[in-house]
Amino acid sequence: MTASTGAGRAPRDGSRNDAPRGGTRYAFADHNCFACGGANPIGMHLEIELEDGAAATTWVADPRFVGWEEKVHGGILATLLDEVMAWAPSSYDSWAVTAEMTIRYRSSANPGEELRARGWVTERRRRIYRVRGEVRGADERIIAEAEGRFLGASPSEKVALKARYGMPAEVTALGAPSE
């Protein structure tokens, strides 16, 4: 699969803005997140790959996730985007939450179709990350794309989150020693 080049402005801090090409997968302690938590019985159970300012996942929607006219619900597509975009700052040793996100829907997705969601950091200023994302279908058509601002966790929040989700404090999300 070809990586996206992340159309739009270039990152100001020299970070890459393309999507992962088979990055690092990190297994967290079970948790209840609807998108990536293994403990949520009705969740999506996404596995996130991380690489240099980017995050990605591949996922197949089953019929539980359809909306009108037997297409994957737009809210589920938004969740895919939100998840990979929020994970993209992880290579900067940051956990992030959505502050603002704008989505453009370009095409519909069918249940049973393999979807690839990718998010990448385009700009970083202190704890604020500008991130772009896209969901593509099995045929590489763009189904949805988004841009947003994400707020990184404070230093004390990072320590608590790493402990809660089973990541050693001295290790970043990509497995490199923290600075």
Where are these regions (language model features)?
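Hydrophobic core residues within well-ordered beta-strands of beta-rich domains
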Residues: 44, 97-99, 115, 129, ...
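Short beta-strand micro-motifs enriched in acidic
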Residues: 49-51, 120-124
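Residue-level recognition of well-ordered beta-strand positions that form the cores
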Residues: 58-60, 102-104, 118-120, 134, ...
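Short Pro/Gly-enriched beta-strand edge/turn motifs at strand-loop
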Residues: 26-33, 114-116
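Catalytic strand-loop segment that frames the active site of acyl-thioester-processing enzymes
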Residues: 31, 35-72
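Hydrophobic beta-strand-centered segment that forms part of the acyl-chain substrate-binding groove
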Residues: 6, 83-116, 121
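Short amphipathic alpha-helical face segments that pack within enzyme cores
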Residues: 76-80, 84
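HotDog/MaoC-like acyl-thioester-processing domains
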Residues: 1-24, 110-111, 122-179
